[in-house]
Every structure is written in C-alpha cells, then in structure tokens.
Amino acid sequence: MKRTLLLFFTLIVATMSFEDIAERIASSLEMTREEVQTCFHKTNATLDLMQIDEISEDRLQTMDFDNSAVKIGCFFACLGQKKGVMTGARVNVDYIKQFISSHKKARPNQLTRAFKILDTCADQVRSKTNECEVSLKYILCFIYKMERTYRSNNIDE
C-alpha cells in the first residue's frame, strides 16, 4: 500500500509544474507562492531532489547527507524560517504545537502523541548547528516516528 501511494504521488509530482508544486506548498503552509519560490531559488532545490523517503531511519542520526539531501534540508529550513517554525538552527516546537492545535481537529490523545514526538525529535537535533541538517533530520524524525505510531496503533486495533 505504501509503495502504491508513493508511486501515485511520484506520478502526480512528475505531471505537475514547478508553479503548481510551489502553489500547493504555499497553500498548505499558509505562505505566498513567491515565498516558496524564493526558497526554491535560494537553495537551488529542484523537484527531482524531493526524494527524502530514500533516507532510511537508521541512517538518520549517523549519516552525513549528500548534496541533494542538504539542498532539501536548506529548502525546508528556508520555509521554516519564513513561517516562524525555525530561528537559525533552532526549531520552535511551541509554535508548531500551536499551529497544529489551531488547524487540526484531532483527538486529544492524538495531539498528545504528536506533541511528544515533536519534543523527542527536537531533542535529537538540539546539539546540531547546521540549519539544513536540523530541518531535514527534524522532519524525517517526525515522519518516521509518526508512521511507527500509526502502524502500532493499527496493529493494536
């Protein structure tokens, strides 16, 4: 199922223009398309570099990212700084929690789990000083831990 969804989204991205992608990112983050395009241009990130799913969880804490991954990390850092989610190489977890609370209609136990994961991932990148590395590792940490939580909840049900 996961591979089917990945293939589906890859095909969608392949058929979408740069402007379409920038517009969707801007809309989901409540930013302007110009702000997103500025981050694309500033970091030299391209759509074909958006393969963060290829970075395995066990390599997340130990690896030195290749140039492509660094560009994507810098792109995420740029977006995060424009949105107020990051200041330099520091993640503003309280802002993220507030943003999630005000925009998502989740059950309290789901929010509690998500907030705990946000805190755990922030602790994992706290000692890092490179904003590109921080943003990429933080996002990947959150994705991996949320997926693991979701899988374990589905198994339990």
Feature-to-residue mapping (PLM):
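Cleavable N-terminal signal peptides of Sec/SRP-targeted secreted and luminal proteins
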Residues: K2-S17
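Mature extracellular/luminal domains of secreted and GPI-anchored eukaryotic proteins, especially small
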Residues: V13-E157
